[in-house]
Swiss-Prot record:
Contains a C-terminal catalytic domain, and an N-terminal region which modulates catalytic activity. This is Protein-glutamate methylesterase/protein-glutamine glutaminase. It comes from Bdellovibrio bacteriovorus (strain ATCC 15356 / DSM 50701 / NCIMB 9529 / HD100). The modification 4-aspartylphosphate is found at residue 57. It is found in: Cytoplasm.
Length: 354
């Protein structure tokens, strides 16, 4: 008989603690081993109970949830899901939670939810099961002098013509994985489009933070943005991102079509459009994440002549999306996270020499 997933619930609201206990008790695979109303009680229970997964509130008495998580990850690393009211959580707090080590951030459940408790329960239980399998200590990006201003390198007019294009898919663990990946790319990075699963309102701050770290431009994509070397475009939350072609140039097309794999943006939309318009001049990468988004799109890119890579299991926080891509035969190579950028650059050199 499989071992149950042992969960510790940390929230100052007795109502939320009871609601989460009710949700978890409906699943035979999950056992609530304890609850805590503040971080100090939670610390003692973490040490005593050694849970597989901790659910954590952000706003709590005596110490906020993010500060507590930072301490937990230093001294007692634990797979953590942050439950927060995303409408109240500022984008900086959201990103800080991910940087501190949260594997997932979910909308805090409430008693007066418009969706049924059954639907809500299914989503939360699915996340807990996936997070229970996650790696706690993925590879971290080494970015020199993160506080120092980064000099941007303008693209030349020649570089603005159509050539190579890079499409990247990432989800759970992806915000940190993207930093590792991008830290290996040069200032004249090929025109790059990224789909990172994030709620609306948070992708802009994420892009702005990345822009401060690297010598190339990183921005949240807008309708009509041109895809050029030296620029990385992040799909905005709640919008699918595709590309279209006009003459020798590629442009961003945003829309709010149906969610795919329960997500919007979905990488499959992007990668299928890249396969259609760019073909063999493209490269595709699927990084860490739950589910299977990007797998079919990466396969279409490969079949169109693009070079494709999936992150290996050992360096993923959650080996879901890359596993799905590998299972379809969509990846030319399966590589550790810190080797993907270098491999793509070698591939570019080979293409340019041909």
């Amino acid at each position: 008989m499989a071992q149950k997933i042992r969960v510790l619930i940390v929230d100052d609201s007795a109502v939320i603690r009871k609601l989460l206990e009710k949700i978890f008790s409906s699943c035979a695979d999950i056992e609530v081993v304890g609850t805590a109303s503040d971080p100090y009680i939670a610390r003692d229970k973490l040490v005593a109970l050694k849970p597989d997964v901790m659910t954590l509130d952000v706003e709590m008495p005596r110490m906020d949830g993010i500060s507590f998580l930072e301490k937990v990850m230093q001294h007692f690393p634990t797979r953590t899901i942050i439950f927060s009211s995303l409408a109240k959580t500022g984008s900086e707090t959201y990103l800080r939670a991910l940087e501190a080590g949260a594997i997932e951030i979910m909308e805090k459940p409430s008693i007066d939810v418009s969706q049924s408790l059954e639907t809500l329960s299914a989503a939360i239980i699915e996340k807990v099961k996936a997070v229970a399998k996650a790696r706690i200590n993925p590879i971290k990006a080494v970015v020199p002098n993160p506080g120092a201003p980064v000099q941007k390198v303008a693209s030349t007019s020649l570089a603005r013509t159509t050539h190579q294009l890079l499409a990247v898919a990432s989800s759970t663990g992806g915000t940190e994985a993207l930093k590792v990946f991008l830290s290996g790319m040069p200032a004249d990075i090929p025109g790059t489009l990224v789909v990172q699963h994030m709620p609306p309102g948070f992708t802009k701050s994420f892009a702005e933070n990345l822009d401060k770290m690297f010598p190339f431009e990183v921005k949240e994509a807008q309708e009509g943005d041109q895809v050029v070397p030296g620029r990385v475009l992040i799909a905005p939350g709640n919008y699918h991102m595709e590309i279209t072609r006009s003459g020798a140039f590629y442009y961003v097309k945003l829309h709010q079509g149906p969610a795919l794999h329960s997500v919007r943006p979905a990488a499959d939309y992007l990668m299928k459009s890249v396969a259609k318009y760019v073909g063999k001049n493209a490269m595709g990468v699927v990084l860490t994440g739950m589910g299977k988004d990007g797998a079919e799109g990466l396969l279409e890119m490969k079949n169109a002549g693009a070079y494709t890579v999936a992150q290996n299991e050992e360096t993923c926080v959650v080996y879901g999306m890359p596993a799905a891509a590998v299972a379809l035969g969509a990846a030319d190579k399966v590589l550790p996270l810190d080797r993907i950028a270098g491999d793509l650059l070698k591939q570019l050199q080979t293409r340019n020499a041909a």
